[in-house]
């Protein structure tokens, strides 16, 4: 194989600010994915979040971590450390949240992201990174990912409703277009018009339950 840059991104902060894609390879918080109807309950109290995706709150709200300017420092020649303090009540979430993210590119050609967070009040949190991959390389991108093969060590997936909220079920992938236990081209079954889940997600936009041995 060839060495290539496979993660899409921006060259400077002005391109980030003016990007039409608000989540392109950005940090996501305080809560990645959707929260139904922009509300949640915690210890008997209900919290209300900004609605920014149909009837739901997505990726931390209208001004989530993806639009924040983080403090940055080099830890060594392999790691970049990012810091951000989310104030109490920011985007409707409880507690002040101090977040540290460490990007590491090591000698084994691994890119590792570590997330650390500390709050002064009970809250909910689901940090992630919204990387956009172009596996053929940024310099020579493929027009679609339909021909790329995917393999997932997962016997189950989580179905969603028509607004992309998990239904609470955990279903078997066997016999469905969601079965990637053996390598399959992504585009082979993505246009299955008879599959309600593919319609709900406009393709694959689901969580998988990865198989993992008990430690």
What are these regions (language model features)?
Residues 1-215:
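An exposed, glycine/acidic-rich loop-and-rim segment of catalytic or binding clefts
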């Amino acid at each position: 194989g060839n060495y290539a840059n496979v993660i899409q991104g921006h060259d400077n902060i002005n391109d980030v600010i003016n990007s039409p894609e608000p989540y392109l390879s950005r940090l996501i918080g305080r809560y990645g994915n959707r929260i139904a109807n922009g509300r949640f309950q915690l210890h008997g109290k209900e919290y209300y979040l900004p609605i920014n995706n149909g009837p739901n709150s997505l990726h931390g709200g209208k001004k989530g971590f993806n639009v924040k300017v983080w403090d940055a420092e080099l830890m060594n020649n392999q790691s970049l450390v990012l810091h951000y303090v989310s104030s109490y009540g920011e985007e409707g979430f409880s507690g002040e949240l101090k977040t540290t993210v460490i990007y590491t590119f090591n000698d084994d050609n691994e890119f590792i992201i570590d997330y650390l967070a500390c709050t002064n009040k009970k809250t909910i949190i689901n940090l992630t990174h919204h990387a956009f991959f172009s596996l053929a390389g940024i310099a020579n991108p493929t027009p679609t990912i339909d021909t790329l093969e995917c393999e997932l060590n997962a016997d189950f997936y989580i179905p969603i409703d028509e607004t992309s909220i998990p239904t609470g079920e955990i279903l078997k992938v066997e016999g469905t277009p969601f079965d990637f236990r053996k390598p399959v081209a992504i585009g082979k079954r993505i246009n299955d018009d008879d599959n309600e889940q593919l319609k709900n997600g406009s393709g694959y936009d689901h969580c998988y339950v990865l198989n993992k041995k008990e430690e």
